[in-house]
């Protein structure tokens, strides 16, 4: 069996890349919408975009700072296509996309897609697919160039060249990237062919010396080398990395192709003419672009204008931080991370590539050992050639990552041909030469199966809408029917919770089934929360229905469907708590009211039992690290629901990871979005390595703090002016500023005339009351009492409230009970935990009521058992327990 020719792999790659391109919805690749905006800006005759976009309007954002070669080619290809509908594509942006790679379906789409994008393509969809095909051609050129590169370096290893081309053609990440609108495929193609041409030029130089060939061949090679170097720098800034590589390869040594030994390390002066020609041509190709940047931004690279848009890396992020937190993401995304860097493959896929990589590296080590022993310097030179370019590209990626957050494997694709050749060379060393004819086809079968499965098994399901269901199918998918209406026409048909108990950091799934009875003009989001007994949010998901793919305006009336929503419990939940799930429909400005089947209004959310949250008695176990110095390993919070002016009691547990790099202080703040702060305490950290310190703090909330939910946040900073240290957890960096959201603090409303704290069982609390008259009413008058209740927890049992006016014998007095809100509002099991409710009752005192002292009696009872909930009086004076297990609220005098 002879090795396949390069044409086979070029064809195979083209087929697969087109398959990926057609499978991925428009704009669902890294920055694809911004890359295409660059193309469109040129195609519309507006020239090259300038920065910043708020001053020179365009939609390309930071991508407008990219060198223009790819975009000029794409604009020339699509200039004739009408694209009046393009802005409608940009208008359908998903406000809640997933930002990190996850292997389950969850808002991977950055845009909402409609049938207007389907085949046959027209307008903007046609133009975008045309540019995607252009990228596919550049990717195919990379496959062909990889084959030529391997054949040039290792001409006796035919299966190595075939294996290298096969590896590039079947790498899912490269297939995905080459099927999108971006400049990565062109950058990879140019870099790969530059490696080939640089080899050709060295060989032509030697043939000229030995065979006295005409200098024209060498001149053409130098011009072609310069064209490729210039094109690389005009495609992507990383293309400039080819320049020092070319100088090093051409200037330091040349290779004798007959003996394949390193024999000449002379200074590059003998090749000064060639250098001037090569780099002169390169500058002629790309120099105008860098001069333009210098004139516009004072920086030839344009980074001075780009970095404010893409964002600078947090202060203190170093090389060790990269390897500890983001190198793994580079590895994953090199092989198979899709979407906007947010759609991962199953874990076993990466284990396959890890095994293949490990085998390739082991084989390379074996090759190097054998080559040294056998003095095969040519093989070592070939490995060094590829390894040097791979190292330069990797250093460039790390340098970029230390500047801004851009840790993605696609940035290594300029060296994809070198990587594939090295891996194929390593695999070939692990088997006898005769077995390679079976090894590479077997590996190709595995890689082909993976590359074919991923579009259908991972990519397509992530962007699919929920399937329509019959009533019977809905009943099979839910454990509890709901029949709750939101607004005028949207119904929640039922639900199912997949877990009964969860721990901090765990993800569980909730199934909700929906149906619209009429057209819905507005796009409403699903807001699903897991609440603790204090009504604080332990987990939350806000999304378009269909996990981002099926906005309500696209629903068909009368068609039901079910969604499965992932909820990840915050790892900072402070204590074990019963969980209550709350679901509602909302926009950015309004929340739809909910109604049960009896027509009772449920507020703006439907509540149903959720899983309990199990937290160790010692508190949550954490590992949040500021820099590489200090870790927060746990905390304890005494109370999370407080009144203005009350004291927050907090203990933080710190551990020093190494000697501190200078003075360090920790700040604890209670604040809202926008920075409105109601409490702050700063204390210095004095820790020895390995020591765990219990940092006990008491903070008084502002006396005028408005009621609502606030964030409790923690940060470590340099008090001498160095700023906050970056904070990391599990490889994830938090936003700049180093503030870690720890938990929520609810500030309750205090507006009652008479404040108290009386609990009825463990479920509800009376916070206070107001009376229409102080403590005196006339016979025949109307007495109105307003009670302020707070729900502490949901236990799933019914409860009704009551209010009586008792006489001196503690029996209800005669008179007319006019009305009570407790008889008209929804049952308590619809209440929201932590929310304060007003309960208003009115009595008309009998006209013949005898004078005397009367009591107002309040309480709660269970209608299923007829038993009352005993009050526990925690605050207030003059209150006593009645013989009926109720609270005697206050005395009322009738003269």
Model regions: which residues?
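Transmembrane alpha-helix segments characteristic
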Residues: 12, 162-164, 257, 283, ...
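Perimembrane helix-loop-helix junctions
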Residues: 197-203, 210-223, 242-283, 372
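Interfacial juxtamembrane loops and adjacent helix segments
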Residues: 41-134, 310-317, 321-324, 340-348
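Signature aromatic-anchored transmembrane alpha helix within multi-pass, membrane-resident enzymes
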Residues: 8-11, 227, 279-283, 387, ...
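C-terminal luminal/periplasmic domains and tails of membrane-associated envelope-modifying transferases
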Residues: 456-895
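Membrane-lumen/periplasm interface segments of multi-pass, membrane-embedded glycan/lipid transferases
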Residues: 294-370, 484-498
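Transmembrane-helix signature of polytopic, membrane-embedded enzymes
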Residues: 6-8, 102-118, 146-170, 189
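Specific aromatic-rich, kink-prone transmembrane helix
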Residues: 141-148, 186-201, 224-229, 418, ...
């Amino acid at each position: 069996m002879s090795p396949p020719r390069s044409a086979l792999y070029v064809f195979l790659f083209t087929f697969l890349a087109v398959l990926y391109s057609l499978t991925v919805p428009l704009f669902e690749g890294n920055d694809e919408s911004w890359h295409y905006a660059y193309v469109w800006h040129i195609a519309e005759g507006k020239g090259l975009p300038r920065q910043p976009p708020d001053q020179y309007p365009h939609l390309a954002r930071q991508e407008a700072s990219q060198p223009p070669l790819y975009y000029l080619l794409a604009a020339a290809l699509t200039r004739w296509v009408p694209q009046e509908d393009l802005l409608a594509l940009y208008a359908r942006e998903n406000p809640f996309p997933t930002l990190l790679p996850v292997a389950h379906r969850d808002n991977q789409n950055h845009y909402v897609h409609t049938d207007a994008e389907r085949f046959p393509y027209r307008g903007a969809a046609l133009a975008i697919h045309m540019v995607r095909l252009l990228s596919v051609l550049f990717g195919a050129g990379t496959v062909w160039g990889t084959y030529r590169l391997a054949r040039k370096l290792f001409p006796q290893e035919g299966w190595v060249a075939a294996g290298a081309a096969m590896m590039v053609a079947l790498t899912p990440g490269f297939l995905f990237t080459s099927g999108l609108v971006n400049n990565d495929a062109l950058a990879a193609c140019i870099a790969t062919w530059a490696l080939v041409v640089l080899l050709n030029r060295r060989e032509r130089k030697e043939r000229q010396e030995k065979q006295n060939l005409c200098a024209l061949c060498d001149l053409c090679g130098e011009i072609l080398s310069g064209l490729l170097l210039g094109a690389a720098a005009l495609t992507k800034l990383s293309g400039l990395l080819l320049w020092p590589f070319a100088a090093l390869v051409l200037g330091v040594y040349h290779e004798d192709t007959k003996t394949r030994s390193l024999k000449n390390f002379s200074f590059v002066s003998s090749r000064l003419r060639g250098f001037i020609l090569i780099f002169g041509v390169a500058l002629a190709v790309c120099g105008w672009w860098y001069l333009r940047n210098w004139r516009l931004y004072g920086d030839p690279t344009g980074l001075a204008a780009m970095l404010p848009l893409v964002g600078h890396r947090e202060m203190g992020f170093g090389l060790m931080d990269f390897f500890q937190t983001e190198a793994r993401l580079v590895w994953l995304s090199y092989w198979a991370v899709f979407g906007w860097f947010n759609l991962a493959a199953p874990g076993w896929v990466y284990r396959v590539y890890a095994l293949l990589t490990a085998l390739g590296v082991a084989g390379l080590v074996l090759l190097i050992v054998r080559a040294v022993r056998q003095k095969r310097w040519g093989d070592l030179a070939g490995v060094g050639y590829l390894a040097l370019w791979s190292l330069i590209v990797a250093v460039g990626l790390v340098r970029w990552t230390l500047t801004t957050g851009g840790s993605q494997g696609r940035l290594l694709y300029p060296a994809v041909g070198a990587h594939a050749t090295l891996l194929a060379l390593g695999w070939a060393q692990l088997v006898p030469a005769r077995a390679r004819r079976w090894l590479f086809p077997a590996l190709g079968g595995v890689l082909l199966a993976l590359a074919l499965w991923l579009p259908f098994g991972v990519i397509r399901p992530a962007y699919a809408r929920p399937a329509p269901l019959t009533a019977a199918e809905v009943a099979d998918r839910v454990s509890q029917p709901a029949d709750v209406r939101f607004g005028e026409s949207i119904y929640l048909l039922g639900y199912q919770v997949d877990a009964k108990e969860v721990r901090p950091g765990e993800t569980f799934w909730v199934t909700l089934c929906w149906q619209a009875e009429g057209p819905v003009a507005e796009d409403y989001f699903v807001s699903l929360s897991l609440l603790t007994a204090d009504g604080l949010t332990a987990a939350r998901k806000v999304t378009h229905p269909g996990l981002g793919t099926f906005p309500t305006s696209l629903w068909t009336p009368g068609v039901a469907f079910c969604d499965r929503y992932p909820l990840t419990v915050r790892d900072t939940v402070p204590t074990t708590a019963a969980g209550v799930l709350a679901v509602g429909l909302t926009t950015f400005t309004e929340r739809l009211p909910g109604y049960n089947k009896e027509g009772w209004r449920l507020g703006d959310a439907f509540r149903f039992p959720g899983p309990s949250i199990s937290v160790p008695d010692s508190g949550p176990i954490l590992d949040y690290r500021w820099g590489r110095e200090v870790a927060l390993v746990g905390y304890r919070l005494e109370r999370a629901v407080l009144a203005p002016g009350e004291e927050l009691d907090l203990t933080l547990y710190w551990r020093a990871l190494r000697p501190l790099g200078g003075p360090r202080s920790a700040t604890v703040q209670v604040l809202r979005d926008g920075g409105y702060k109601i409490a702050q305490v700063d204390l210095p950290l004095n820790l020895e390595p390995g020591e765990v310190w219990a940092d006990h703090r008491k903070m008084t909330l502002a006396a005028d703090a408005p009621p609502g939910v606030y964030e409790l946040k923690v940060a470590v900073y340099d008090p001498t002016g160095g700023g906050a240290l970056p904070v990391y957890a599990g490889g994830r960096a938090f936003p700049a500023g180093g503030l870690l959201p720890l938990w929520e603090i609810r500030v309750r409303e205090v507006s009652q005339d008479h404040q108290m704290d009386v609990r009825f069982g463990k479920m509800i609390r009376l916070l206070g009351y107001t009376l229409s008259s102080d403590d005196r009413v006339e016979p025949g008058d109307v007495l109105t009492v307003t009670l302020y209740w707070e729900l502490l927890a949901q236990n799933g049992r019914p409860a009704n409230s009551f209010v009586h006016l008792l006489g001196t014998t503690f029996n209800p007095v005669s008179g007319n009970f006019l009305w009570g809100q407790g008889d008209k509002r929804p049952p308590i099991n619809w209440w929201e935990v932590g929310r304060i409710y007003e309960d208003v009752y009115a009595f008309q005192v009998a006209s013949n009521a005898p004078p005397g002292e009367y009591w107002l009696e309040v309480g709660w009872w269970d209608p299923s058992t007829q038993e009352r909930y005993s009050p526990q009086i925690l605050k207030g004076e003059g209150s006593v327990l009645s013989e009926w297990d109720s609270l005697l609220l206050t005395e009322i005098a009738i003269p």
